[in-house]
Structures are given as C-alpha cells and as structure tokens.
Curated annotation (Swiss-Prot):
NCBIfam families membership: aden_deam
InterPro entries per UniProt: A_deaminase, A_deaminase_dom, Ado/ade_deaminase, Metal_Hydrolase
Necessary cofactors: Zn(2+)
Classification of source organism: Bacteria, Bacillati, Bacillota, Bacilli, Lactobacillales
Species of origin: Enterococcus faecalis (strain ATCC 700802 / V583)
Name of the protein in question: Adenosine deaminase
Function text: Catalyzes the hydrolytic deamination of adenosine and 2-deoxyadenosine.
Originating gene: add
Gene Ontology CC annotations of this record: cytosol
Binding-site residues, substrate: H17, D19, G172
Site (Important for catalytic activity): H222
EC id: 3.5.4.4
Binding site for Zn(2+): H15, H17, H199, D279
Cofactor note: Binds 1 zinc ion per subunit.
Catalytic residue list: E202 (proton donor)
Length: 337
C-alpha cells in the first residue's frame, strides 16, 4: 500500500482522545494565552507530551496527559483543542471522527460541566465547517470518580444528545474498577438509550470485555486481553460487538510486547468486527494513515482489507442510517481504482 493513497482514502476514526491528540504547537498557543510556563525548546515540549515507543506500563504512558490537562481548563482552550483535532483529521483523510473526553477532568478553574461540553462541541463544529470532516463527541466517565459523579456524566450525554454527543464511555483504572463496579451507571445509560463504547481488556482480563458487553456495550475500546480468553470470542461475534483496536498505543503501554502476541489476526479469523484507531494522536505520535501502514508492514494488509476495516468502523459508528449511507457511498466511490 502507498502511504499517499492511504492518506487520501476516506477513513473513519472511533477511538480518539481529545486530551491526547493536540498538536504541540497548538498546546503552546493555548498555554501561552493562560501564562502557563512550558519548555521553550520544541523538542523538550514534545518529550513532555509524546510517550516513548516503550513505556514501563499504562500509568507511565498516562503521565503525558498531566501537563496537557493543566492547559485544558478554559472554554477557549477546549474549543481550540477540539478544532485542532479536526484539522489533523482532515490532513489524515478522515471522513468521520468521534472524539472522546472526560468532562470531570476540566473543572479545575471553575468551568461547569455543560460549559465544558459546549466548548468542545463548538470547536468540533467549527472544524467541521472549515475542513469538511464530520464529527461527534463521546463523554467519558472516569472509573476512579464517585458513582454519583459518573451518573452526572451519563445525564450530561443525554442532555446533549441532539447537539453532538452520541455515546458514553468509561475510561481509567480498569484493574481496580472492573465493569460490574458500574452496573447501576450503565443501567442508567441503557435506560436513557445512550450508546455505550467501553474501555475494557486494555489491561486486566478478558472477562472485563465480556462483562462490558453483557452490561450493554456495543463497542469495546482495545479488548486486547481477549487474546488469552478465547472462550469469550463467540459472545462478541454473536452480539456483533466492534473492537476499537489501537496498534501503536497497545505496544507503547506494554499491553503487548511482541507482534506475535498482537491479536489482530486472531480476532479477524474468529470473525470479529475490528476497526483501527489512533487512541492519542500526539501522545502516541501517530495518525490513522500511520496505523494502516503499520498493518500493511506487519500483515501485508491490502486495500480491500483496509476498506473492510473502514466499513466495520462505519457500521459501528454512532450515526443515523442516513448519515451512514452517505459515508458508505463516499467510501465505495473512493475505492474505485
């Protein structure tokens, strides 16, 4: 596959974290406006926000978010960050993207939860107008927060369902807070008909993935731990659950150490629906184009297979049938070569 063609082909991204995907140059602008000190040297700034190829573990990887979050505590900063992610998506040939973020992590300077969501949606929509990339938002509850606080995020997702929030996610420490910790929260989301995509099996165990599906998730973020529990693969196939795989990130965090361990082919051969994502464009120093090129190198991925992975993403996207139909036509048209 040729990188320039892969970049041009319309792609769908469903697993992209706002706070992990802001260009260092944009972050510098955001920080300077708030008088937040940061390294003058571009390389030093990059080292602050880009994780090394091999982190000691997931927590080591996540330290890159600490500085970024200190900069994302104003409406202006959040709007600029969201706009920046859409401009990157446009350069990457992304036709549709779902950008996720945790509102509870942006309240340090007194922003109210609805103000936070409004700021991000404003940036996304401005980006859509300027660059032609369709986008929606997903709200994350942080697993370490109080249940009551997470329930507020579920209600928030419901309140903004007409203006660009299309789903709910749980992110954070999966080992200490497995899915059944949140049975009531997820029951509320199901009751309010909020689509669920949950982080599960990034670390921890395959049972977390099965439990997340049982609790209503139609998509799973990562799901890598399923490789060690093949008994759950049939459940995901039967329920037509989409696995949002993020290759670069999964190696960086130490979720897998070698290519032989990476379960991409195992999942495909088991008949599971898989899609490819960046996770964190800046922290993982990647693009969706780079992710597909990695698969081409590792598995000799073909254009037909890339198209199928893109269609898997579209099928699992939290969009209306009409919106999917238009994007489907765009994908089919682009692959006529």
């Amino acid at each position: 596959m040729e990188e320039s063609r892969v970049r041009q082909l319309p792609k769908i991204e469903l697993h992209c974290h706002l706070d992990g995907s802001i260009r260092p140059t944009t972050l510098r602008t955001i920080a300077e406006k708030q008088n937040i000190p940061l390294p003058q040297d571009e390389q030093a700034l990059k080292e602050l926000v880009v994780a090394p190829e091999k982190c000691t573990d997931l927590n080591d990887y996540l330290t890159r978010f600490d500085f970024v979050l200190t900069c994302l505590q104003t409406a202006e900063a959040l709007q600029a960050a969201a706009y920046d992610v859409i401009s990157q998506a446009a350069e990457d040939g992304v036709a549709y993207i779902e950008v996720r973020f945790a509102p509870s992590q942006h309240t340090e300077k007194g922003l109210r939860l609805p103000e936070i969501v409004t700021a991000v949606l404003t940036g996304l929509k401005q980006g859509e107008e300027d660059f032609g990339v369709k986008s929606n938002a997903l709200l994350c509850g942080m697993r370490h927060d109080q249940q009551q606080a997470i329930e507020k995020i579920v209600h928030l997702a419901h309140d903004f369902r007409e203006t660009g929030v299309v789903g709910f996610d749980l992110a954070g420490n999966e080992v200490d807070f497995p899915p059944y910790t949140f049975e009531d929260v997820l029951a509320l989301a199901n009751q309010l008909s909020i689509p669920l995509t949950l982080h599960a099996g990034e670390c921890g165990c395959g049972k977390n993935v099965a439990d997340a599906v049982t609790l209503g998730a139609t998509r799973i973020g990562h799901g890598i731990a399923l490789k060690d529990t093949p008994e759950y693969l049939a459940l995901l196939k039967e329920k037509k659950v989409l696995l949002e795989m993020c290759p670069t990130s999964n190696f960086q965090t130490g979720t897998v150490k070698t290519l032989a361990e990476y379960p991409f082919q195992q999942f495909i051969e088991a008949g599971l629906a898989v899609c490819i994502n960046t996770d964190n464009r800046t922290v993982s120093d990647t693009t969706l184009t780079k992710e597909f090129m990695k698969l081409a190198t590792w598995y000799q991925l073909s254009y037909d297979e890339m198209k199928q992975l893109t269609k898997n993403a579209l099928a699992g996207a939290f969009l209306s049938p009409d919106e999917k139909k238009l994007l489907n036509q765009k994908i089919d048209q682009a692959y006529l070569f």
